[in-house]
Amino acid sequence: FQAEDGIRDSVASRGLGDVYKRQEETLKKTNLMNISRSSKLNLERSMTANTEIGGHLVSGHIHGTGEVLKVINRKETKDLLIKIPSQLREYFFYKGYVALNGCSLTIGKVLKSSFYIHLIPETVSITNFKEIKKGDLINIEVEQTTINTVETVKRVMLERKA
């Protein structure tokens, strides 16, 4: 397995241009329909049991896309303001984790329908965030522990009301 912009893929055939089978849901939930031959993608191989973890665990199961609303370029860093898909809003917390285009990142300030990400020089230099611009779509994978916690609390609260 490997991931392109955070999208987990299985190779269907190997050769001079690996072939991947993509499910319809993958095409609907990701930015794949918006990329071109010249687009730069973040590529990453699956981790192994002895791989060092440099962030939170990322599965490659994309939950949706977010539109880049603003890019603030600084000397070596960048700040991005990204629209949160409405169905994912409840999973975004200040200092929580999110994977954007496959990169494990920490959430900055959360607004009503958007959030900030502050990219460090290393992330800007080795990812496609170097070329990100307003209007681009970014793949979003919400951190699984956050989803599990929110959903458990919601279920317990509903059971207590009943």
Question: Where do the language-model regions lie?
Answer:
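Ordered, amphipathic secondary-structure segments that act as subunit-interaction surfaces
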Residues: 22-65
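Glycine- and charge-enriched low-complexity intrinsically disordered segments
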Residues: 39, 45-49, 139-144, 151-156
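A structural feature that tracks compact, well-ordered secondary-structure segments
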Residues: 13-14, 21-22, 71, 90-123, ...
